[in-house]
Design a protein with these regions (language model features):
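Charged, amphipathic alpha-helical segments and their flanking helix caps
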Residues: 1-25, 46-133
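Short acidic low-complexity segments
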Residues: 28-39
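A short, hydrophobic beta-strand-centered structural micro-motif
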Residues: 38-47
Length: 133
């Protein structure tokens, strides 16, 4: 049986939620459900795109929101040490194989300035979904 984007997003969320939840100090959310005013170290998982073939293929987005650290004089800077930890964590996580899914890193993990309080670490995973239905 084929699955839609929201179902695939939820499957990926269910696959990684426990490990990511233990790793981050904030919460793990589906796309569009992270509290707007959160400045915690959160993770958001979202469906990007998919091809509906015998083996469904596509991409999912995993974003980590990393609070900036105080550099003194009211200046906040990117938390490089924590971003490196997240990158290493994700590299181990993407090797996960389930009965239904295979995951591959689509592109180099990168970070950019979300705002003056947090940095966004972006991971794009490619998936292949195998179904015997």
């Amino acid at each position: 049986m084929k699955k839609g984007g929201t179902q695939i997003e939820k499957d990926v969320f269910d696959t990684f939620q426990t490990e990511i939840g233990a790793f981050v100090s904030g919460g793990v959310y589906l796309q569009g459900t992270r509290p707007h005013n959160s400045f915690e170290e959160d993770c958001v998982i979202g469906f990007l795109t998919g091809l509906d073939k015998d083996i469904q293929e596509g991409k999912v987005n995993i974003n980590f929101y990393v609070p900036k650290i105080n550099a003194g004089a009211q200046k906040k800077i990117k938390n490089i040490a924590r971003i490196l930890e997240i990158e290493a964590f994700i590299c181990g996580l993407v090797t996960r194989i389930t009965n239904e899914y295979r995951f591959y890193q689509e592109q180099t993990i990168h970070s950019f300035e979300e705002d003056d309080k947090q940095t966004l670490v972006n991971v794009v995973l490619r998936y292949k979904r195998f179904s015997n239905y």
